[in-house]
Amino acid sequence: MALDVKSRAKRYEKLDFLGEGQFATVYKARDKNTNQIVAIKKIKLGHRSEAKDGINRTALREIKLLQELSHPNIIGLLDAFGHKSNISLVFDFMETDLEVIIKDNSLVLTPSHIKAYMLMTLQGLEYLHQHWILHRDLKPNNLLLDENGVLKLADFGLAKSFGSPNRAYTHQVVTRWYRAPELLFGARMYGVGVDMWAVGCILAELLLRVPFLPGDSDLDQLTRIFETLGTPTEEQWPDMCSLPDYVTFKSFPGIPLHHIFSAAGDDLLDLIQGLFLFNPCARITATQALKMKYFSNRPGPTPGCQLPRPNCPVETLKEQSNPALAIKRKRTEALEQGGLPKKLIF
């Protein structure tokens, strides 16, 4: 068994260091058997005492789920093997991510580009939800793009099967800026709506080229949501007041969506409105979103091979584009993950 693990590890030739997070290091490598370029995510499992932090559970969950999934818009897990206190996951190599594209001010994102990114995101998400899986951590840097412009959902460390009646989940999921209001109010029972709200935030970020609702705390996040979209009433969201962490907010009128997204047509505004419905039971699903007029109306989505590619190194873009927001994003993610990331997080 040990020889098998060692031979599998030797199968991959490391080519470049891609990034490091609190629990994982990512390398670009070449599969010597197939000559395929891959990404290896080396996770530090640690000792049993550290397993209480969920490191082991997160890695095993990601492996288990990805082994069962196969879709053009879901990252492919090619191999997985353990050695000592580490486990290595071998993935499709992806050239960049949506956060890099959004931040590269030298790129012009046309309506057709944005439609293509949203189409691929929703197709991958529809597949997940049809297989009773919530991603629970959708954000631009978890939407990866390969050299052919194909977008794939990645980082399934927080993903979870759903559908069991009366089953409670943790509400401490999804990076705060993309977190649905029901999670911010402490909901323990939730469904696909948490992913759909995150998609709405990603779509808004594609249109505005900056994070839509960059809150500093859960309370500030809710305040930003209500100031922008209006404070929901009990008629709009019947179960709101019964949520564990519900607090009463000032009644904000909100800003009309066509004022925020002034270049968006009615079909796109309808999609945005459906994604940002406060009542999670009324919020549109991925399947419903894909059937909306926005995706059938002109212009059509840009083919993947014609989508823009970043002109600057990834690190330069992530650190130099809007430095204040970049620092704020890193600080927010670090606090939620319990430590400071050293470089890119795969």
Swiss-Prot record:
The keyword DNA damage applies. Keywords: Acetylation, ATP-binding, Cell cycle, Cell division, Cytoplasm, DNA damage, DNA repair, Kinase, Nucleotide-binding, Nucleus, Phosphoprotein, Serine/threonine-protein kinase, Transcription, Transcription regulation, Transferase. It catalyses: L-seryl-[protein] + ATP = O-phospho-L-seryl-[protein] + ADP + H(+); L-threonyl-[protein] + ATP = O-phospho-L-threonyl-[protein] + ADP + H(+); [DNA-directed RNA polymerase] + ATP = phospho-[DNA-directed RNA polymerase] + ADP + H(+). Inactivated by phosphorylation. Repressed by roscovitine (seliciclib, CYC202), R547 (Ro-4584820) and SNS-032 (BMS-387032). The association of p53/TP53 to the CAK complex in response to DNA damage reduces kinase activity toward CDK2 and RNA polymerase II repetitive C-terminal domain (CTD), thus stopping cell cycle progression. The inactivation by roscovitine promotes caspase-mediated apoptosis in leukemic cells. Specifically inactivated by THZ1. Ubiquitous. It comes from the Eukaryota. This is Cyclin-dependent kinase 7. It comes from Homo sapiens (Human). The lineage of its organism: Eukaryota, Metazoa, Chordata, Craniata, Vertebrata.
